[in-house]
């Protein structure tokens, strides 16, 4: 599938592979993962500033869109043209560093 190909191209090549990591989680993680619902706690984070970043080609984009809808203000959703799910891990040409710096500066120091 395209999703398998995207993850393979990152995690199984020099781009994202490391001899110190494994994509095989311990079996004890499976139950925790299956019981994890990330949207459940959004209201405990809001109204703190929330920033959601997704790629317009990301298979996971719908999750960012849904989380953004559930979050209270202040919130910001940034969609990066041409980016897939893993592209923002290492494709620094796509990472909006100026926008990230502005968000954190405004959010962590609202007085300027």
Which residue stretches match the model-derived regions?
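Catalytic active-site module of serine/aspartate enzymes centered on a nucleophile-bearing elbow/loop
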Residues: 81-112
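Conserved beta-strand scaffold positions in the cores of enzyme catalytic domains, especially
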Residues: 77-79
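Conserved loop-alpha-helix segment in the C-terminal half of the alpha/beta-hydrolase fold
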Residues: 57-75
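Well-formed, non-transmembrane alpha-helical positions, independent of function
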Residues: 41-44, 66
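Structural motif corresponding to alpha-helix initiation and N-cap regions
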Residues: 35-39, 61
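Acidic beta-to-alpha connecting loop that harbors the catalytic carboxylate
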Residues: 55-58, 82-84
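Accessory cap/linker subdomain of secreted extracellular hydrolases
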Residues: 1-25, 29-30, 39
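Short beta-strand/loop motif that positions the catalytic acidic residue
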Residues: 45-46, 51-54
């Amino acid at each position: 599938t395209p999703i398998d190909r995207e993850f393979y191209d990152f995690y199984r090549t020099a781009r994202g592979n490391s001899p110190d990591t494994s994509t095989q989680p311990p079996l004890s993680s499976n139950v925790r993962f299956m019981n994890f619902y990330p949207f459940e706690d959004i209201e405990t984070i809001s109204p703190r500033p929330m920033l959601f970043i997704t790629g317009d080609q990301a298979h996971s984009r719908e999750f960012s869109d849904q989380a953004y809808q559930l979050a209270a203000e202040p919130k910001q959703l940034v969609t990066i043209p041409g980016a897939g799910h893993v592209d923002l891990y290492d494709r620094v040409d796509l990472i909006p560093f100026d926008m990230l710096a502005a968000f954190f500066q405004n959010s962590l120091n609202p007085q300027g």
